[in-house]
C-alpha cells in the first residue's frame, strides 16, 4: 500500500468498558433487568480513568448500571463529557424467562465447555438469542462508526455486548467472541480501519484490567490522551 493510500485510511478507536459488578442480583440471572451496580471500589475507577482517552465521545446502553459506571469514572478524575449518548442497541441480551433463575444452577445444566447461556442461535424463552444481540450490536457499531469516524469512542456496555463487538472485530464470527472473558470494569479496545474499499479491525487489547498492575509498572498505565497518536494503518 502506498503512502498516499495510507493517508486515506480513517481509524476509529473503540474503548469498551463493561459495567461495574452487580451485587443485588441474589445470584440470579439478570440479563436486561435494570439493576444497579456497585461502584464503591475507587482504586478500580482511578486505574480505568488513567487509560481512557480524554477527547473521546461517550456512549452507554439504556440500562442504569452502565450510566453508574460512567459516573464513577468521571468521579475518579476523568473530565466529564458534555454529553453521553444512550444506545439501547448496546443493552445486554434479553434472557427472557431465564432472568431471575439461579445462575449457578442454570449454568450447571449447560453442556461442558459452554461459553454462554445457550448456543448462539438458541433464543431464551420469550427473549433473544445471542445472534439477535450480535445483529443489533453490529448494526449500531456500523452506524456509530460512520457518525464518529476518526474519533475515539468510549462505549460502556455489558459482557454480551462486548463479546459481540469482539466477534465482529474477529471477522464477523460471533461464536469466537464468546470465547473471551469480559470482566466487570475491564477495558477492551477495538480499532476500525476504513477506506473507500477496505474495512479491517485490530484488537489492541481485550479484557484489560489496569487496576491489577502495580503503580511502579508505568508501561501498564500508558496515557491515552492527545499525546498518544495510534498508527493510521491497515495492518
Language-model features: locations:
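GST superfamily/GST-like fold recognition
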Residues: 159-163, 186
Amino acid at each position: 500500500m502506498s503512502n498516499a493510500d495510507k493517508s486515506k485510511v480513517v481509524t476509529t478507536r473503540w474503548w469498551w468498558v463493561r459495567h461495574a459488578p452487580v451485587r443485588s442480583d441474589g445470584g440470579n440471572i439478570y440479563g436486561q433487568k435494570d439493576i444497579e451496580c456497585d461502584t464503591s471500589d475507587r482504586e478500580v475507577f482511578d486505574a480505568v480513568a488513567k487509560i481512557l482517552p480524554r477527547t473521546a465521545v461517550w456512549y452507554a446502553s439504556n440500562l442504569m448500571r452502565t450510566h453508574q459506571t460512567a459516573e464513577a469514572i468521571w468521579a475518579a478524575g476523568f473530565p466529564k463529557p458534555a454529553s453521553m449518548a444512550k444506545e439501547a442497541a448496546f443493552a445486554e441480551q434479553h434472557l427472557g424467562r431465564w432472568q431471575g433463575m439461579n445462575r449457578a444452577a442454570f449454568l450447571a445444566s449447560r453442556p461442558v465447555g459452554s461459553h454462554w447461556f445457550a448456543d448462539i442461535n438458541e433464543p431464551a424463552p420469550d427473549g433473544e438469542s445471542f445472534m439477535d444481540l450480535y445483529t443489533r450490536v453490529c448494526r449500531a457499531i456500523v452506524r456509530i462508526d460512520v457518525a464518529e469516524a476518526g474519533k475515539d469512542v468510549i462505549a460502556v456496555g455489558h459482557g454480551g455486548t462486548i463479546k459481540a463487538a469482539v466477534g465482529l472485530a474477529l471477522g464477523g464470527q460471533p461464536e469466537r467472541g464468546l470465547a473471551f472473558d469480559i470482566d466487570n470494569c475491564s477495558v477492551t479496545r477495538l480499532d476500525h480501519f476504513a477506506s473507500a474499499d477496505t474495512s479491517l479491525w485490530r484488537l489492541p487489547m481485550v479484557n484489560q484490567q489496569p487496576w491489577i498492575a502495580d503503580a511502579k509498572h508505568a508501561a501498564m498505565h500508558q496515557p491515552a490522551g492527545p499525546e498518544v497518536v495510534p498508527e493510521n494503518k491497515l495492518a
